[in-house]
Amino acid sequence: MTITSWLAASRHTVVLTGAGMSTESGLPDFRSPRTGLWARFNPSELATIDALYHRRESFVEFYQYRIRTLQQCQPHDGHRLLADWERRGIVQTIVTQNVDGFHQEAGSRRVIELHGSLRTVHCQRCGESKPSFVYLHGVLTCECGGVLRPSVVLFGEPLPEKAITEAWEAAQQADLFLVLGSSLQVSPANQLPLVAKRNGAKLVIINWEPTELDDLADAVIHQRKIGEVLNELNEQLAEVDP
């Protein structure tokens, strides 16, 4: 059996996407020293509640940079193919560690965002939400007087309970679980493939570098761009089910 045949036969495919999915769109990642965001900022210090209140200027500069960078990038072929696979009933759920909103922009509808979204900001006091571009125009406080912050999970904050529950349920239902561009170092996302495997799912990992779960996977692909691999799989799917 091949990845293509598993995709064709699957009744419930769940996809987990990580930073590698976003970097192919040109977005810098958090975890690459001297590249990505570490070249200009220290995310472990600035992406925190403490920085929001006590290093406000640096916090705002950091997230203005991230929002501006996001506006300059767009979904790639991999995002668009996953959306197409959802429309065709090949993919049922996408769980993402990314905050860029590219899956939704590409057309995916069933997306679970574990770490929130950089597409909106919200008030720490009243919870009112606004499009994140207002941050670029210096709108940093809410009408109620509360502090506005990006709607992402900051270091030290709990992940949204609803997203975790939905992701866990999706993993339990999966008969095929694809990992795309995740190093599987961050919990609880790195537990989802294990949940799927325990429930009998096939596990496929496509990531540039090896992961700690590679030995448990039914298929592993390294050193390949995700968009290219998905394009190849899509072409093979057309041959399996023309």
Swiss-Prot record:
Domain Deacetylase sirtuin-type, chain residue ranges per copy: 1-242
Primary location class: cytoplasm
A cellular component annotation (GO) from this entry: cytoplasm
Annotated nicotinamide binding sites: 30, 99-100
Binding, NAD(+): 19, 23, 30-31, 97, 99-100, 115, 182-183, 207, 226
UniProt keyword terms in alphabetical order: Cytoplasm, Metal-binding, NAD, Transferase, Zinc
E.C. designation(s): 2.3.1.286
Superkingdom in the source lineage: Bacteria
Subcellular location: Cytoplasm
One term of GO molecular function: zinc ion binding
Required cofactor(s): Zn(2+)
Active site residues according to the UniProt entry: 115
Catalytic activity: N(6)-acetyl-L-lysyl-[protein] + NAD(+) + H2O = 2''-O-acetyl-ADP-D-ribose + nicotinamide + L-lysyl-[protein]
UniProt cofactor note: Binds 1 zinc ion per subunit.
Enzyme class: transferase
Protein family per UniProt: Belongs to the sirtuin family. Class U subfamily.
HAMAP family the UniProt entry points to: Sirtuin_ClassU (MF_01968)
Family matches, as NCBIfam families: PRK00481.1-3
Function: NAD-dependent protein deacetylase which modulates the activities of several enzymes which are inactive in their acetylated form.
Protein name as catalogued: NAD-dependent protein deacetylase 1
